[in-house]
Curated annotation (Swiss-Prot):
Gene name of the record: BZIP24
UniProt tissue specificity: Expressed in young leaves and cauline leaves.
Taxonomic placement: Eukaryota, Viridiplantae, Streptophyta, Embryophyta, Tracheophyta
TM region(s), chain numbering: none
Cellular compartments annotated: Nucleus; Cytoplasm
PANTHER family, sorted: BASIC LEUCINE ZIPPER 24, CCAAT/ENHANCER BINDING PROTEIN
Main location as per UniProt: nucleus
Any GO BP: negative regulation of response to salt stress
Organism field: Arabidopsis thaliana (Mouse-ear cress)
Protein name: Basic leucine zipper 24
Extra facts: Plants silencing BZIP24 show enhanced tolerance to salt stress. Enhanced salt stress tolerance in silencing plants is characterized by enhanced root and leaves development and reduced sodium accumulation in plants.
CC terms in the record's Gene Ontology section: cytoplasm; nucleus
Length: 227
């Protein structure tokens, strides 16, 4: 069976046709050109079926109240399916790709900025540590110089203490002999005197000397003070 009808545009459409070529229906011949036209109409029908589908069902309503209020009726529902054209799909995919690329670029830019800031922070930290290291080295060098100077001063102090002790002993001995005088006679020789500075005199006796003969004496001097 063949069904011929007109669509909303006034075009004649044929459905449920035989796939064989050269089939006649009355005065109409379905050749290759008509078959292409029929196939195009079938594709439009399929698109229309995909866009809008309808269904019906029957159900009973039992509202509260008297039994006469119960009834049954048939409902028709139309289900609409939106089909996006290829151009819209391409535009959507292009926009998605652009958004993805923009998002990737933004993420890369943020990562580079973060890495740059981290590098700058590490460089500043290295410079700070180098400065601290130089300060510690200078302190160590100054400490070594101080220790060397301390050793030198200690040695100088010990030397000064020794000199002071020598001077004090000499001064104490001179103080004990200050103002003393004596005459000592041994083997007919006179050991003479001590002056006010307690410089001991040693008299050398020779044979035949008397008290009236001149006396040769040797007066020792205190050790010189070394500076």
């Amino acid at each position: 069976m063949f069904c011929c009808c007109k669509d909303c545009r006034g075009n004649q459409r044929v459905s449920n046709f035989d796939s064989l070529t050269g089939v006649f229906f009355g005065d109409l011949e379905f050749g290759p050109q008509n078959q292409r036209y029929i196939k195009m109409n079938e594709e439009e029908d399929k698109d229309q079926d995909r866009v809008t589908r309808g269904c019906s069902h029957t159900h009973s309503c039992n509202p509260p109240g008297p039994e006469d209020a119960s009834h049954s009726h048939t409902c028709f529902h139309a289900h609409t399916h939106l089909i996006i054209s290829d151009q819209q799909e391409n535009d959507h995919s292009d926009s998605s790709n652009k958004k993805r690329l923009c998002g990737n670029r933004e993420a890369v830019r943020k990562y580079r900025e973060k890495k740059k800031a981290r590098t700058a922070y590490l460089e500043d930290e290295v410079m700070r540590l180098q400065s601290l290291n130089e300060q510690f080295l200078r302190k160590l060098q100054s400490q070594e110089m101080v220790e060397t100077e301390l050793i030198r001063l200690r040695a100088l102090l010990v030397e000064m203490q020794g000199k002071i002790e020598v001077e004090l002993c000499s001064f104490s001995f001179q103080k004990q002999c200050n103002g003393s005088g004596f005459v000592f006679k041994e083997d007919g020789c006179n050991l003479a005197t001590s002056n006010m500075m307690c410089e001991a005199a040693r008299v050398e006796c020779e044979e035949g000397q008397t008290l009236h003969d001149p006396i040769q004496s040797f007066v020792p001097q205190p050790p010189p003070f070394s500076r």
